[in-house]
Amino acid sequence: AAGVRPNTSFLKDTGIEMLPNGAIVIDDEGKTSIEDIYAAGDCATVYHLVKQDQVYIPLATNANKLGRIVGSNLGGKNEKFQGTLGSSCIKLLDMEAGATGITEEDAKNMNLNYKSVFIADKNHTDYCPGQEKIYVKLIYDADTKVILGGQVVGKSDAVQRTNVLATAIFAKMTTEQLGMLDLCYAPPFARTWDALNIAGNVSK
């Protein structure tokens, strides 16, 4: 992939605040550093809840949410963007992968006191057809055990489990809480201890 970069070179001499890559810095209402000028989408930054900073993550989810907020605010409302976790997913052949929050590399670059755990499990019970391996990685605060990020990979059900992790990170859940989280169980869909429960329980 060639990657994405903001097409904002025409703003170079306007004085508008931008990141080094040209992304327009905005606040939680979509306002730029120039009064009455708003921005949203792949040209603008988003606030990352874990990094606690304005970052460039050009995703359709972020663009749509901020577009709605900017539109509402231009119409006289006072709506605020609650922040992103950079949740994303991909399908390659028969494999799917999802990520949310920060990666272990991010944690290192941020000089966080963190721990990580990696587990291999199955997506559901062995007596139902379609059982596949599933892999979960968690990054969490070493002191508080608050979950900071995670990735899930497998042939089936990886992305939806990533959505659960996104909810857990947004709610500032700990690994202990994830380990005991009451998730749905039926033999075709999960095991009595879901892979996410297991990942939480081994994160000490």
Predicted regions: what they are:
Residues 1-69, 164, 168-171:
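FAD-site-proximal beta/loop scaffold in flavoenzymes
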Residues 29-30, 89, 128:
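Short secondary-structure boundary/capping segments
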Residues 21, 85, 102, 133-135:
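Short beta-strand-initiation
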Residues 26, 40-103, 188-204:
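A conserved FAD-binding loop/helix module that cradles the flavin
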Residues 2-4, 42-43, 88, 93-94, ...:
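Glycine-rich beta-alpha junction loops
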Residues 17-21, 77-88, 113, 117:
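A short alpha-helix-loop-beta-strand transition element characteristic
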Residues 95-100, 109-204:
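Flexible, glycine-rich terminal cap/loop adjacent to redox cofactors
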